[in-house]
Structure formats: C-alpha cells, structure tokens
Amino acid sequence: MAMSRRKALVTGATGLVAAGIGGTLLLRPDDVTRPHDAYFSGLNALLKREGPGHPIMFVDRARLLHNVDLIARSVGPEKTWRVVVKSLPSVPLLREVMARGATHALMVFHQPFLNVVAREFPDADVLLGKPMPVQAVRRFYADRGAERFDPARQIQWLVDTPERLAEYHALARELGVHLRINAEIDVGLHRGGLPHPGVLRGMLQRIAGDPEHLSFAGLMGYEPHLTGATSVEEPAVQAALGAYRAFVDVIREAGHDPSRLTLNGAGSHTLRLYERDDLMNDLAAGSGIVKPTDFDTALL
C-alpha cells in the first residue's frame, strides 16, 4: 500500500530526531566560547571604568576617519561624495565627516532633518533622498528661520512622477519660491521613479515653461539591487547604467549639459563599482562609515 505524503513526512521527521538523539547532534552549537579580542576587551574595560552605566552608542573616531578616507578615495576628486544624513544623524558627527571628506554635499530623507541642516550647515548642497509629500515641502518653508541657507540654490527636490511635479509647481507658485527639481529614475529596481525616458520629456517641458518657479537640477538612480555585484562589467550593472544613460540622453536632447547637473547614484554597497565609470558624477554613501562589518565584502 502506498504511504501517504503526511505519514511519510512524519516518519521522516521522527527518523531525523532519532538519528540526532542516537548519534552526535551535528547542528548543536559549540559549547566553547571565545573572549573578546584585545580591541573589544579594551573598550569593554574603558566603558566599565568611565562609562555612564547605561547603553550608549560608541564611535571609534580613528576608525571612523579611516573609513571616511577610504570612501573619499573611492569617489575620487572628479566626482562629488554626497554624505547620507540618515546614516549619521548627529550634527557634530556630520561636521567631522564632511570636513575630513572635503564635501559639503548631503542627502536628506526627512523634513525635520532638512530644517536642521539648513540651520546648522548654511553652505550645504542638499539632495532629497526620497520624494517628499508636498505638505512636507510646505512645512519646510513654514519652519524656516532667518538662516542664510538659500533653498532656491541649495536644495534639489526629488520628484518621481509628473503628478508630484505638478503639485510642487503649484506650491512654488503659491509660495512665490523657486524649486530645483531632481528626477528619480528607475534603473532596474522597479520600486518607484520614472519608468522610462519618455516620461521625463514631458516633465522637462513643464519645468522649462516656468523658469521663475522651477529649474531642472539632475537625476537620481537608486540601485540597491546591485548589492553583491563585484564589477562594473557584470550584466546587471551594465543594464542599470544603460537605463541611466537613456535618461541622460533625453536631458541632453532637451538642451541641458549633463556635466553641469547632479547625476546621483550608488550607496555604501555599490560605491566602488563606479570607480572607473564616469556616467554618474555624484555618489551617495553614509552607512559604510559607521557600520563597516555590514560592508565587509569582496568589493569593499
């Protein structure tokens, strides 16, 4: 008689348990643990001796600056390193990283952070890392103080659809402000952004039609799906660059000089892929400075 699937599964599971009990437990973790190495033992002793007695976030300044140097060297002098603020949400820490990395370019993901950046970093060049609801743009202007930071020159607002651009356009007219627009493009992630270059053409026409309130600042292509790639020659990387290049062709056809625009991409996981590629001139990274073990890969 044929054995039922359920009975076979139960029998098989019982056999595995029996084998585990009867033999050695191969999946059991080792009982022997190891002490911390000298570095972490020293930190542990320091915190026991001088720490506040509650959990803290500890940043090793020497190692942080070493990581900053590595990233700055990878980006190179011909491109802009844009520091991701959400990965380093501390004004003194940002000051240290920006000074060491010789950059004033920041990527911001949160309206309250944007207002802090405008106040604390009056010379910053800011690109929004995600499209903000139009209410957040309104709130930014409502919460502004008397700082010398000039949003019309120093912020690139990210838009991902013609509809969002229309909302931003209406707000710019209402408030009497000028918005620099950076277009989020889909380069293979398929999780937002303009799906094809034809959509960008119509948006560029709207922007060109009202230079008092709008101007075009560049492109942003988010590509975390390339995490794990080790060479710019890999097909997935080439496909992403090909998609990006098609959008660049459209902005060139519209009369823009790409070299004068922000062509942003990358992240800590993919930054080094583009060391020998000059399509993008603006590369973002932040987490790799303070979470190096997350990025301890063959590429990095």
Question: What are these model-predicted stretches?
Answer:
Residues 83-228:
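Active-site-proximal beta-alpha core segment in soluble small-molecule metabolic enzymes
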Residues 59, 160, 285:
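A conserved hydrophobic position in a structured secondary element of the catalytic/binding core
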Residues 64, 68, 161, 165, ...:
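Aromatic/hydrophobic pocket-lining residues that form the small-molecule binding cavity
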Residues 13, 180, 186-300:
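Active-site loop/helix belt of alpha/beta enzymes
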